[in-house]
Amino acid sequence: MKHLLKLLDLSKEEIIDILNLADQLKYETKHGIEHHHLKGKCLAMIFEKSSTRTRVSFEVGINQLGGYAVVLAGEGSQIGRGEPVQDTARVLSRYVDGIMIRTFEQKEVEDLAKYGSVPVINGLTDFCHPCQILADLMTIREYKGSFDGLKMCFIGDGNNMMNSLIVGGLKVGMEVAVACPEGYRPPQEILDFAAGYDGFTLTDDPMVAAKDADVVITDVWTSMGQEEERAAREKAFAGYCIDEKIMGAAKSDAIVQHCLPAHRGEEITEEVFEANAGPIFDEAENRLHAQKAVMVTLMKD
């Protein structure tokens, strides 16, 4: 494993290895055990999309690992002014030990890895969100013990979250059901991948997706860069709000996850959100531990 570009690239064993390491690093963090696996290492962080959780979790994480971060905002770097990605990749590779990028186009992440000579981590693209899904899987395993026999459902937009959850969930052996309106489905590449698994369901009915689910997941209906579509999306997703009715179709001990920020009253009700604040904020914390595991896996000598 040289990079984390998308979960499609990883085997089940590689995903489980990252989760096991994340569990270990979380334990050590909670018990004050230092783990400077990346002492003196530098992570360049490129942000072409604004961020709270991604920036803080990566910066805190690399510091806890004994390294440090250099932050490049899109408008404050040459990559944001039109410098070819291949040139940025080759220059940064001379300065730093790893690159994390949060951007729009998946191709930009792939090109950084292609032309650079240091590990590249996808902090988010419009196509996928691998770090978030590793945190989600870590949280699911914490609450449920294992992935065996579990059903995970995602209700909402066929966006980067849904794409990565389908891939990650199926690869670790869960049944995966997703509900989204016509016109907001995952891309064909993801559906072609899912077609190779027996435990996948695609529907436009949230109640069908949620039936007997152990984990119910949602995300915002309007992602960054889609603000002009808000009114149309709110109309299309009417009936897709995670409420008590939808939760009633899931198992009685089902947990809810949301990658945040949440728009309460849109994709999830205030009541369901607060009833599941424990797993939701554990999920947010686990971004730190999962990403530390990714950095150690990729950047440790």
Where is each model-derived feature located?
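Anion-binding alpha/beta catalytic cores of soluble intermediary-metabolism enzymes, centered on
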Residues: 97-168, 258
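Adenosine-phosphate binding glycine-rich loop
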Residues: 253-254, 260-301
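Glycine-rich phosphate/diphosphate-binding loop of Rossmann-like nucleotide-binding domains
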Residues: 48-60, 143-218
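Positively charged, low-complexity intrinsically disordered leader regions
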Residues: 1-56, 60
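Active-site cofactor/substrate anionic-group-binding motifs, chiefly glycine-
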Residues: 42-43, 47-95
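Structural alpha-helical scaffold elements that stabilize or flank donor/cofactor-binding regions
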Residues: 92, 112, 208-209
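Rossmann-like adenosine-cofactor binding region
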Residues: 195-271
